[in-house]
Amino acid sequence: MRQILIAVAIAVAVSILLTPVLIRLFTRQGFGHEIREDGPPSHHKKRGTPSMGGVAIVAGIWASYFGTHLVGVVIDGKGPSASGLLVLGLATALGAVGFLDDLIKIRRARNLGLNKTAKTVGILVAAVLFGVLALQFRNVDGLTPGSAELSYVREIATVTLAPAVFVLFCVVVVSAWSNAVNFTDGLDGLAAGAMAMVCAAYVLITFWQFRNACATSPGVGCYNVRDPLDLAIIAAATAGACIGFLWWNAAPAKIFMGDTGSLALGGIIAGLSVTSRTEMLAVVLGALFVAEVTSVVVQILAFRTTGRRVFRMAPFHHHFELVGWAETTVIIRFWLLTAIACGLGVALFYSEWLTTVGA
């Protein structure tokens, strides 16, 4: 628990202090956000707001992770783990793709950055590398960061994927989550606030896995997860970095995270879900992100097949704006729904453990 508290404190401090520095720097450089011409009229006033604030989030996560482990090495000699570095590597690689996308948008002064092919290739490369490496680095207990067995709240022994299929599965998971968070980042503070809640839920889940790990506490209901405490540290660091960033990103936002932040945060969810063996449970925890990306898919399919739109605008947070909800109303209500989803997800996780141990 000490490491988790340290991780949150460092991440909040770095993010909340670095973000205003980036605001001033990006404002001087003219790194302003471009607004969709077909977007809600109320968003046009946001044109020129500094973007790429995700740099502060990623920096906060890295500083927190290594700062926490620096303290850990001094106290108990434990350093970074393969699982932790894989998740951070995935998030950073996706953040780099997002950074290039943001930079091109700014340089060209339009809301279109990397072309679809380049962006897809970047995400694909990061996902494939993650999938391949997730089945390496076997520890003394025979555990790798990822598992070829599909998982809900723990591995489902009856559903085992071949290595190549597992890598393909990782590509789907990474692509889905990175796009889901990216689509959600359309209102001031919405994605950052929701992400903080999802990561807080993951802190509880991974810390419980650590306390009931088969390697240290064998018995009924134990978890075969490699490096669960390190995953809890990453989840705590991400939650802290999002909270620090939210101080400046809350409505009216002084800076946006951009694709730099949204793609990186999507990578965090994808990485945590795979390494903690909770790929299916993550859909419940991140229900808001799932709903947002689903609204886009539904809108596209409906328009291509019928020529009609289901929503006035997708992602569907814009639909609610266009029907008369104030932006802050949409944000707060979506945060409430996220809190409910996270509570439900944690309850499902814990109830499965109670059922397993026969409590």
From Swiss-Prot:
Function field: Catalyzes the initial step of the lipid cycle reactions in the biosynthesis of the cell wall peptidoglycan: transfers peptidoglycan precursor phospho-MurNAc-pentapeptide from UDP-MurNAc-pentapeptide onto the lipid carrier undecaprenyl phosphate, yielding undecaprenyl-pyrophosphoryl-MurNAc-pentapeptide, known as lipid I.
Enzyme Commission numbers on file: 2.7.8.13
Name of the protein this chain belongs to: Phospho-N-acetylmuramoyl-pentapeptide-transferase
Pfam families linked: Glycos_transf_4, MraY_sig1
Family under the similarity heading: Belongs to the glycosyltransferase 4 family. MraY subfamily.
Catalytic activity: UDP-N-acetyl-alpha-D-muramoyl-L-alanyl-gamma-D-glutamyl-meso-2,6-diaminopimeloyl-D-alanyl-D-alanine + di-trans,octa-cis-undecaprenyl phosphate = di-trans,octa-cis-undecaprenyl diphospho-N-acetyl-alpha-D-muramoyl-L-alanyl-D-glutamyl-meso-2,6-diaminopimeloyl-D-alanyl-D-alanine + UMP
The species this protein was found in: Mycolicibacterium vanbaalenii (strain DSM 7251 / JCM 13017 / BCRC 16820 / KCTC 9966 / NRRL B-24157 / PYR-1)
InterPro entries: Glycosyl_transferase_4, PNAcMuramoyl-5peptid_Trfase, PNAcMuramoyl-5peptid_Trfase_CS
GO molecular function annotations of the record: metal ion binding; phospho-N-acetylmuramoyl-pentapeptide-transferase activity; UDP-N-acetylmuramoyl-L-alanyl-D-glutamyl-meso-2,6-diaminopimelyl-D-alanyl-D-alanine:undecaprenyl-phosphate transferase activity
